[in-house]
Amino acid sequence: MRPLAKDTGMSVASVTLASALQVRGEALSEEEIWSLLSLAAERLLEDLRNDSSDYVVCPWSLLLSAAGGLSFQDHVSHIEAAPFKAPELLQGSNEEGQPDASQMHVYSLGMTLYWSAGFRVPPNQPLQLQEPVHSLLLAMCEDQPRRRQPLQAVLEACRIHQEEVAVYPAPASLHISRLVGLVLGTISEVERRVVEENACEQRNRSCSLRSRLHQADGESPGAPASDALQPRRVSERSAETQSSLERCTAHSRNSFVNSTFAGAGPCDCEESPWYGSEPMLLAEAESSQPATSSPRNFLQRKGKFSRPEFILLAGEAPVTLHLPGSIVTKKGKSYLALRDLCVVLLNGRCLEVKCDMESTAGAVFNAVMSFANLEETTYFGLAYVEGEEFFFLDKDTRLCKVAPEGWREQHPKGSVDTFTLFLRIRFFVGHYRLLRHSLTRHQFYLQLRKDILEERLYCNDETLLQLGVLALQAEFGSYPKEQVEGKAYFRIQDYIPARLIERMTAIRVQVEVSEMHRLSSAPWGEDAELEFLEIVQQLPEYGVLVHRVSPEKKRPEGKMALGVCTKGIIVYEVRGSRRIATSQFPWRETGMISTHRKKLTITSSTTGKKYTFVTNSSKTCKYLLGLCSSQHWFNAQTGSKHPSHRFTGQDKFAQIASLSSAHQTQANPITWIQKLSCSENELCVPRLQDATGGQLGTSMENKQGFKEPGKERIGSSPYTGGEQLHSIGLNQKPAQTVFGTAGHSMCAGSNCLGRRTQICCFDSVSGSQNSKRKGLFGEPNQDIVCVMLKRDPVHGFGFVINEGEDAEQTRSGIFISSLIPGGPAERAKKIKPGGKILALNHISLEGFTFSMAVRMIQNSPDDMELIISQPKGVCGTIHSEEKNSTASSGMFCTDILSNRCQGRQSPHIHDQDRSVRGTEMAQGAGSCPPSPLQTNTGEIYFVELVKEDGTLGFSVTGGINTSVPHGGIYVKSIIPGGPAAKEGQILQGDRLLQVDGVSLCGLTHKQAVQCLKGPGQVARLVLERRGPRAAPQCPSADDRMGDVHMAVSLVTARPGRPASSVSVTDGPKFEVKLKKNSRGLGFSFVQMERGNCIHTKSDLVRIKRLFPGQPAEEHGAIAAGDIILAVNGKPIEGLAFQEVLHLLRGAPEEVTLLLCRPPPGILPEMEPGWQTPELSGDQRLTMATCAGSEQSPSLDQEDNWRDSTSLDAGEGLSPGPESSYKDVRQVKGDREKERPWAKSWMHPMESHPHVCKLHPEPETPALATSLEKDMRQNCYSVCDIRRLGSLELDRDGADGATCFLPESSSLTVDYEEYLTLTSASAGQLPCEECLEADSETIPLPQFCSLGALLKSSLPEESQGSESDWEDLDEPVDRDEVLRWTRSARQPLAAEP
């Protein structure tokens, strides 16, 4: 953070303008804008003179000081800064030369203040600004640089305004201070005083205490004699005191060291300046004690066993420290009342502190930190234990307020209760690189190591064994060469929790850990500790302070706990020894936290809903409130202020990335911090199950737990004598990255497989991990560069990317591994191998996996802008041949479309590559964006929509609190004529990834809707194409009024091969393993009888449709039309339809399918919409209620297609009234005259010798209304019960095939919902009887009332649930839910 001026230092208490506006909740006033404008213009001019204006002015880079100052920070994200960048900066360099920096800053400043003036102001309301300032801001925001106001003119306008206002105008700094006060007002007064303390005075005091404490043997040559600390004799402890210490630390003590001042006695407070607000330490350890500056000298002791530090030091004699007692004058007499306070350090050492009852926790804390020689005191605090929970003390808390009653009272015999405090970590950093000192990192290791051993921090068995081996490497060293096999060289209980030992037996665990230790290539010593921290910091419960609570209403399912971290609050359900996260409240979605007696209430700022929890006492309730306040305060501080120290290499990059108010884009171990918005920190953080495992499930406000690293700060104690905060208001934003799969690479060139590929290497690919760890702190600073690349027809963009740890890359993300010689990237002369791609075409890659980044580069336009963070070092290259680069390196090119490549890939990769080629050819043909039909599956595309009447023109479905896998947000329907429909690129089923830079990963449905309803008029969306199986786009109103043509698939043989020789088994066979979720397998199938086509020798079971977001669709290898050959090894050839259905439904949770993909042209395409003709809007039918039971008409036995239907389909099926039936016939007759394609069906199709033929039937079909199409598309239905006319294949010799319409039909009513099949709902199939093998007629149930139909159709879990699908638009009327469909001989479809 830069100082405001050379003589004025920026206060530590500084916040961003965006944070101040979030807390304030309204726009800036006109006077505040003038004040900011004046100070910012002066600051910009000063920075331009000093050539230090390498930043972009935006609400997240503008820092406000509590002293009224203003500065700018340069570590905001590209996503946040992009809307405020000058147009000439976004366009890059031009022929006219470099743009003027001052004019760019003028534009950014004007946009920032204009944004602040319109913060949360509805678009239809004017800004509350007078003409002078409004005109000035508009002039500053001109697109043309020459038309903008210069900075000197802006300053002159501010000066004129100051002269025109009142005689004594308020200074600009006063407005700044008030804005900062709004943010600081959300924390306790104690924390504010801590913030405003003079940092220099703290450092001086800390140095003085340390120098007094650590004088060797009490002899310091340069110290005055009066200040010398002289140790006294070592005395034996009495049995009484010994017993108390044993109770305090659970370890035996034999002796202790007592060091005090010579002649200690009552003293006057005026004799020393240290007797003011801070106590003076009067004792030090005896010279024989181990030096605290080298706490790990004992680690390589050669004993029978090597034991952890916190166990060895716990058995040593305690060290006595003396604090001066407070001078109490009573009736002219002074007296001193000392008590023994036991403080246990993280390394297990016990300190016996002699203190006064009136001493504060801050005095003891300062003395302990000085003794331990810990300089980074921010992360630590003193806590006492109550039950199994730690309660941290505020620095101003007096010990007598929290000590046991027996400790406060003075007994005649001198026996008092023991009062024990523990030094523990309160703020857990996101990564160990953020800690400056190795001793601080060692303290983190010690606490996490012990917490895992004591099972305070949960992790799975595999991770426990891995961490045990790393701890053994750190504390014992490498596996001993002279070790005798089978002989124990360590105590297993010192490294593995008792729970795992009991389950696996001690002998088995000992053998397994020893073997892992022998085979381990991990470093030893401090490097092993860092690797230990790296893994632990990815655990779900890392950094969370957990306290037991109860729900407001007692529930039988179990206990609850509340976890507080720097990102928010997590609600756990306690089941045995495990905690399962059920709800989470990030600060940005927490409006207020309040307490009333024993009740703690959390109010959501997005939904307004209140969540109440009950604690065991009012003090605990207030403590939790203060803890939340301190966590929120610490999050705001770390998110807005500039790093207080300079980092080098990776350290600086990680620190800037972590403390940025924009987002916490950190290195590889920090990938769990998901960026939910571009300027704040978020609660939900996906973690790794273990070091190499997959991600855990996520959740935001409802079920499915999910966690992130937290950092705890000294909070307000519920027991302080002062006023207690009873409610706090919270409003912030979040940050995210997504962890991808390591080991993949992708080449952005054109012919990278045809030439040698360069692989970036730093020192040595096979280098030791020790040198790798040391490089983390010694690399040069990172450069952030912006590069514009133009696609080359030969080399593409000219660089190769990969993801994950490669050589020295220890961060997660998308990295440039090498440059292609002669390519655009190399010609740019700015890109170096090893750099991390932060953004591509103004879209941050922090929310994208490797495959998504590949698709973005493949489908990007010819001009691409890259934001890269790269080291200053030069990387070497390793050349490999084409074979190695494709087989082992996993390289991918945008045009790897040759047959040789496809031969080595899976079937779904073939399809992707073919679609990629089609996309790139389309893009190369012109500059216009590709149409939705041209885009390939999985493509990431960018759309800007301008809201109309406050809506974007589409509705969404999904969310982390719904049953959609991974909690994705999908486009549910497109409103005809709306912004999305006009834009034309968005299709139903596409997945929404980002909205205005805010990632939708991990959001609930309501939160996603809230993001889409943001205050901006223009929404910038990032979507992922979900493939051709997504529902087609909703037709416009004009299309619905016109004719709707029936899509017909014509089957043709492949050229050059006789039709008689074509077989459905010619296609590739492959095996797929699917795991059922709560909704089943996620696909429907049809059974096609052998009489349908000459190429089928038996009945075929084919995949009809894949449901979005379900296991089959998520797997990626299955496509509509695939033939099912076997289920879990059992062939289905010859099985009846019902047997296949039961085989799939009765399968275990994991199902193995043997599939075959038929060659193109052999079988009809599986297009779900081709069998359903529709009526136009003016020909909709009305439904008449029919009482009584009616028997359904008998159906022909010549059904040739049996299409199964999902079990969650509607249950209200009934034949329609006769009048309506006649109307349908009339409608058909009228519409047939207008359809030329209907006539073409009546003639032979000689060009297709083996096309399907329909049976002649006199009756016309009942056409569905256009509402059916609307509902089928908008609701994304997967559960149609359609009884449409079926096709039959009938060979007709040389006459070809003639198509006729079905003979008979009837009407049914169907209510559809977007649900998927569950195997448990097998009995809910509306017409189960029709699926029986011997059934020749389909009895339809009697018609029921509309209310009963809706009630019976809705599953119980969806009624009154907050997780139901919600649209952004008005809900469909209940009457429109019912529709008419044809029900002739069309079979049913079922979903396994």
From Swiss-Prot:
Pfam families: FERM_C (PF09380), FERM_M (PF00373), FERM_N (PF09379), PDZ (PF00595). Functions as a scaffold protein and likely plays a role in N-methyl-D-aspartic acid receptor (NMDAR)-mediated synaptic excitatory transmission. May be involved in synapse formation in cone photoreceptor cells. May play a role in the regulation of tight junction formation. Binds phosphatidylinositol 3,4-bisphosphate (PtdIns(3,4)P2). May pNF-kappa-Blay a role in the regulation of NOD2-mediated NF-kappa-B activation in immune response. This is FERM and PDZ domain-containing protein 2. It comes from the Eukaryota. It comes from Mus musculus. Residues 15-197 form the KIND domain. Interacts (via the second PDZ domain) with CTNND2 (via the extreme C-terminus). Interacts (via the second PDZ domain) with PKP4 (via the extreme C-terminus); the interaction directs FRMPD2 to the basolateral membranes. Interacts (via the second PDZ domain) with ARVCF (via the extreme C-terminus). Interacts (via the second PDZ domain) with NMDAR subunits GRIN2A/GLUN2A and GRIN2B/GLUN2B (via the extreme C-terminus); the interaction is direct and is likely to promote NMDAR-mediated neural signal transmission. Binds GRIN2A with lower affinity than GRIN2B. The FERM and PDZ 2 domains are necessary for localization to the basolateral cell membrane. The FERM domain binds to phosphatidylinositol 3,4-bisphosphate (PtdIns(3,4)P2) and is sufficient for membrane localization.
